[in-house]
Every structure is written in structure tokens, then in C-alpha cells.
């Protein structure tokens, strides 16, 4: 952190993130207007920067409830995720460091979706989601090498809202039905987008601040999905989305927009 306002120039850092995961969802019709469900999932992640790389494994467990009020579906849920990471850092001087650390993530969310019929098996669906996430991250210890860094544990909080609209077409056929949908969405980080600092220190040295860059508050996205539901209970779907953030600035940095692709496929059985 530049306490003395020295002109220290600028630098550009590029980061690429890859996430691969799977999840299982179970839902039980508790009553005519209420369903209860569980979500169990896991993923592998890999983040690459110019001089470092972090690989992670995560497991997620969540529960939710859905309430049906005519064309309106209300959903509330909560979950917890445990993640472990292997981090590797290199320096221009040829030194390399590694460490393992973990974090716990807790989230709660509320969602509402209204389905408005506008034609023959054609629906215009609008939705809104509000979520709160709390992350408790362990400190890091790179060992006893020269210029190895220790960091303190740190917590982060985010409050995020999302609104969107989908156009959905249901196509009945002899052995079940197919559903095609496509839409647009807007996401806003209400709280937690500002830059933060993690306290670190070289071995035997004094404390210094490590910058956690600010986040882009606004993003827009498009999505598409195809789902097949057969009379024998088999369910299959494929979906994809693309989102892009607006370039954002603060007093010490700029986040340049970078698109994000998400693709997925699922298969299940409906009892």
C-alpha cells in the first residue's frame, strides 16, 4: 500500500479462472403448495495469474424451500461450502513458494419467479434474486524460505441482486415434453465490491497490506437452455450463459471487462 503517495507507476495483471463442477438436487413435495429440497455438489477450480497459480477443490451442501402461489414461485435457501486450495507463487528472481489453505463460505438467498402465459405453451418469465455471502478465509504460510510471506485470516461479505426475464416455450410430444428458453439478466453487487486488504508479512518482517482489488459492480448476461422430461421420469438438460461486466475504476485501479462463459449439462430422474 502506497502510504507516502510516491509515484510508483502502474502495472497490469491478467487473471483467468476455470471452474468445473457437478451437483445433485433432490426435491420433495411436502404439500400442494410447498416443496423442500437439498443440493449437494462439488467443483474443481484453477486460477492463473502472470506469476502464480491456485488450484482448489470445493464441496457444497444446501437446503431450500419453494412456495407456489399461482403463477408465482417463491424460493428461499441457504448453504455452506468448504474449499481447499494449493497455491504456487514465483518471483522475478527465480524463487518459488507454495502453500495450502482453506475457506468456509456461507450463503442465503431469496428468489421470486413469475410465469406469464402469452401464447400457446409460450411463457414470459421474470425473476429477481437477492443473496448474501460470507467467506471466512484462512491465513497462508509459505514456509521458511527467504522472502516467504505469511498472511492473516480474513473475512469477506457480499450482497448481490439479480433481475432477469426469460422467454420459454413448452413443446409437448408423445413421450414427454421439451422446454426451450432464452433470456437476459442484470446483476448488481450492492455491498462488498470495494477493494480490501489482507495483512501480510515477510518472515521476521513488519506487517504490510496486500491489496484485494475492487470488483465490478454491474454485469449483464444472456442465457439459453433446453430441457427434456420423459414420461418415465428421466430428465435431461443442457444450458449455457455468457456475461460481461462494465469497466470500473476506483482511486487505485481499473477492472477491465472480461466475458465469462458457463456451460452445463444435467441428467436426473423424477419420482
Annotate each predicted stretch with a short phrase.
Residues 1-116, 241, 246-255, 260-266:
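Outer membrane beta-barrel translocator domains of Type V secretion systems
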Residues 9-14, 50-52, 84-102, 136-157, ...:
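Solvent-exposed, glycine/polar-rich loop segments of beta-barrel outer-membrane systems
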Residues 36, 62, 66-67, 151-271:
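Outer membrane beta-barrel transmembrane domains
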Residues 43-44, 131-133, 185-189:
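Short, internal active-site loops enriched in acidic
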Residues 47, 74, 85, 121, ...:
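Intrinsically disordered, low-complexity acidic/polar segments
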Residues 77, 125-126, 180-183:
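Beta-strand segments within the central parallel beta-sheet cores of soluble alpha/beta enzyme folds
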Residues 109-139:
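Transmembrane beta-strand segments of outer-membrane beta-barrel domains in Gram-negative
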Amino acid at each position: 500500500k502506497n502510504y507516502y503517495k510516491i509515484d510508483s507507476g502502474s502495472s497490469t495483471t491478467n487473471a483467468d479462472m476455470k471452474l468445473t463442477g457437478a451437483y445433485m438436487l433432490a426435491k420433495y413435495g411436502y404439500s400442494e403448495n410447498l416443496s423442500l429440497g437439498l443440493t449437494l455438489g462439488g467443483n474443481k477450480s484453477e486460477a492463473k495469474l502472470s506469476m502464480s497459480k491456485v488450484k482448489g477443490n470445493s464441496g457444497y451442501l444446501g437446503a431450500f424451500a419453494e412456495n407456489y402461489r399461482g403463477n408465482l414461485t417463491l424460493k428461499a435457501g441457504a448453504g455452506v461450502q468448504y474449499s481447499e486450495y494449493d497455491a504456487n507463487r514465483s518471483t522475478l528472481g527465480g524463487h518459488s513458494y507454495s502453500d495450502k489453505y482453506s475457506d468456509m463460505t456461507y450463503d442465503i438467498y431469496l428468489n421470486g419467479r413469475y410465469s406469464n402465459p402469452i401464447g400457446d405453451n409460450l411463457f414470459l418469465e421474470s425473476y429477481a434474486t437477492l443473496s448474501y455471502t460470507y467467506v471466512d478465509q484462512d491465513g497462508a504460510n509459505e514456509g521458511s524460505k527467504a522472502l516467504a510471506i505469511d498472511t492473516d485470516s480474513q473475512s469477506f461479505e457480499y450482497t448481490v441482486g439479480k433481475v432477469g426475464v426469460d422467454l420459454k416455450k413448452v413443446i409437448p410430444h408423445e413421450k414427454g415434453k421439451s422446454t426451450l428458453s432464452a433470456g437476459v439478466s442484470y446483476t448488481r453487487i450492492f455491498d462488498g465490491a470495494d477493494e480490501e486488504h489482507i495483512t501480510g508479512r515477510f518472515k521476521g518482517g513488519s506487517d504490510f497490506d496486500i491489496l484485494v482489488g475492487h470488483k465490478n459492480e454491474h454485469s449483464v448476461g444472456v442465457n439459453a437452455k433446453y430441457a427434456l422430461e420423459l414420461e418415465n421420469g428421466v430428465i435431461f438438460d443442457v444450458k449455457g450463459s455468457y456475461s460481461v461486466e462494465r469497466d470500473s475504476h476506483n482511486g487505485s485501479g481499473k477492472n477491465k471487462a472480461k466475458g465469462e462463459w458457463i456451460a452445463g449439462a444435467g441428467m436426473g430422474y423424477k419420482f
